[in-house]
Amino acid sequence: MTHNDVWTAIDRFATSKKMSCSGLAKCSGLDPTTFNRSKRWSKEGQPRWPSTNSISKILASTGAKIQDFTKYIDEPDAASHV
């Protein structure tokens, strides 16, 4: 599992809930910019990973289980869930 895999899963999960990443963050009680693409890498080029707390909050706010999220990590075609 890579940095990109986790961020792609968040993007796909948000889409599956008919939300933008910003909308998903806001719905979850997070800052709306939490999942912005600009925050996925530091200014020094180091990857920033989403926190387990953030993932926990998006699951709780949507009533999803961890399996509902992790299925998007290895999914080759997100279009089937749009």
Which functions belong to the PLM regions below?
Residues 43-60:
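Short, basic-rich loop-to-helix N-cap that marks the start of a DNA-contacting helix
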Residues 32, 37, 60, 67-82:
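Short, charged recognition helix plus adjacent turn
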Residues 1-27:
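A short, Lys/Arg-rich alpha-helix, primarily the initiator
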Residues 29-48:
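Recognition helix of helix-turn-helix/homeodomain-like DNA-binding domains
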